[in-house]
């Protein structure tokens, strides 16, 4: 990536809207926009005060045609999103206007930004670290208020400060040890292996404290996948509609109505839940329905929690017995549906076939048992409602993995000390932990890995 060129991209989602935004960043941002922006003020944008808003029109530099009436927002570096000169052109929303303005900018020598390049520039220019850059994606993807709160705290630098404090303690220890190893003749107080061990113990405790937040953090960030499975006409779609409190899935008496999986998000006591209504599982010669059945089985394998809906008004079918065997000993809820009708299956009959988290009698069509389902899901994932915290929290798999590896390196150094290994070997493990922590914030991460991470971003961000 070249930081000496100027980039542009549409920053708003495609479609019809009140406002469309084209973002421009780089050393020529003010000059390029100035060539196409006409306002009553004769002062060039580059000479105007930063963090100001200006009204005018975008005019094609070759044809003289007015493209749109706009507002231009001027933010000069380093006090901008990218820490470079940034100009945002706010025009009328829609497909045509934003594209035409972007085309004119590109014709003036500006380069089309890559995915995530604005945020990547903010990172490379030192305005944010990698955890904060990733938090921006998490804010965009947040499904609940709690997951948003976790992401905002991370963007504010809560996690970064915690990691940097750990790194500072480790590098101070490394520096002292390496000086005593490299310059034994100097009058520097030598540190014993036992003193190193004593110094590492509180650092390991802090790592354990942070790792203890990982399950809760990941849950708030990613949520849980709940797959609703069962035979056709068991009431899966009725259950989904009752949970969503809307008619999202079509409900009929015809078996095989749901031929593909329907996916929705909802929040249950602060937990983002990815709810998937799958096709009814049965033997069928219908090609489309059989594809839906296969997908249902795939979701069964991937699910964090399986909800098996059984029509309690009919005797247990062979396919249902097979499904019960498949989900036994997994986080699972068995719903004996159609409680408003005469029941042919008792809870005891199901319990005899395996170990399940909960067996509940409901009537999805009548909306009975929905509160109980919410309680069961919540207790399954965390033993109660999950709240965000203002403290540092691990929620990203990459961060969790690197923190575990860093702790493992320090554990190795403790073992090396207890085994009487020389100090220079002990320092190697401590330095490895320091570098792994740097990978979390991006201070020691390879450029290729940085490139890969920013590919997750959209254009214009």
Report each predicted region and the residues it spans.
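Conserved beta-strand segments of alpha/beta enzyme cores
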Residues: 111, 272-274, 358
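A glycine-rich (often HGG/GG-containing) alpha/beta subdomain
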Residues: 1-149, 153, 157, 333
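Inter-motif core of Ras-like GTPase G domains
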Residues: 289-313
């Amino acid at each position: 990536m070249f930081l000496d060129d100027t980039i542009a991209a549409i920053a708003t989602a495609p479609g019809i809207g009140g406002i469309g935004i084209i973002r421009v960043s780089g050393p020529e941002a003010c000059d390029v926009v100035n060539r196409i922006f006409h306002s009553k003020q004769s002062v060039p944008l580059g000479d105007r005060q930063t963090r100001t808003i200006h009204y005018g029109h975008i005019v094609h530099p070759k044809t003289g045609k007015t493209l749109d009436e706009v507002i231009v927002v001027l933010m000069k570096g380093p006090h901008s999103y990218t820490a470079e000169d940034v100009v945002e052109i706010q025009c009328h929303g829609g497909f045509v206007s934003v594209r035409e303005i972007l085309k004119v900018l590109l014709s003036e020598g500006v380069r089309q930004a890559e995915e995530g390049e604005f945020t990547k520039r903010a990172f490379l220019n030192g305005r944010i670290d990698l955890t904060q850059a990733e938090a921006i994606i998490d804010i965009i993807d947040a499904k609940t208020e709690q997951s948003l709160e976790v992401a905002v705290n991370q963007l504010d630098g809560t996690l970064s400060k915690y990691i940097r404090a750990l790194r500072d303690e480790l590098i101070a220890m490394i520096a002292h040890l390496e000086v005593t190893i490299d310059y034994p003749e100097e009058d520097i107080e030598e540190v014993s292996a036992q003193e190193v061990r004593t110094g590492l113990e509180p650092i390991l405790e802090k790592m354990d404290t942070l790792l203890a937040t990982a399950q809760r953090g990941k849950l708030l960030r990613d949520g849980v996948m709940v797959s609703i499975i069962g035979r056709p006409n068991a009431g899966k779609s009725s259950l989904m509609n009752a949970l969503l409190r809307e008619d999202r899935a079509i409900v009929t008496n015809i078996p095989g109505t749901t031929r593909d999986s329907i996916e929705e998000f909802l929040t249950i006591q602060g937990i983002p839940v990815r709810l998937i209504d799958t096709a009814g599982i049965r033997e069928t010669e219908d090609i489309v329905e059989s594809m839906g059945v296969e997908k249902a089985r795939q979701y069964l394998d991937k699910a964090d929690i399986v909800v098996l809906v059984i029509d309690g008004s009919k005797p247990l079918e062979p396919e249902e017995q097979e499904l019960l065997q498949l989900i036994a000993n997994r986080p699972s809820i068995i719903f004996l549906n159609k409680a408003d009708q005469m029941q042919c299956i008792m809870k005891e009959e199901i319990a005899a076939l395996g170990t399940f988290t909960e067996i509940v009698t409901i009537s999805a069509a009548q909306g009975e048992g929905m509160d109980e389902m919410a309680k069961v899901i919540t207790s399954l994932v965390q033993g109660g409602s999950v709240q965000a915290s203002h403290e540092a929290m691990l929620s990203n798999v990459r961060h969790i993995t690197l923190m575990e590896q860093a702790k493992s390196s320090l554990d190795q150094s403790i073992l090396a000390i207890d085994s009487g290994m020389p100090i220079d070997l002990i320092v190697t493990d401590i330095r490895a932990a320091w570098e792994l922590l740097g990978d979390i914030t991006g201070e020691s991460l390879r450029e290729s890995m940085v490139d890969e991470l920013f590919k997750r971003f959209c254009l214009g961000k």
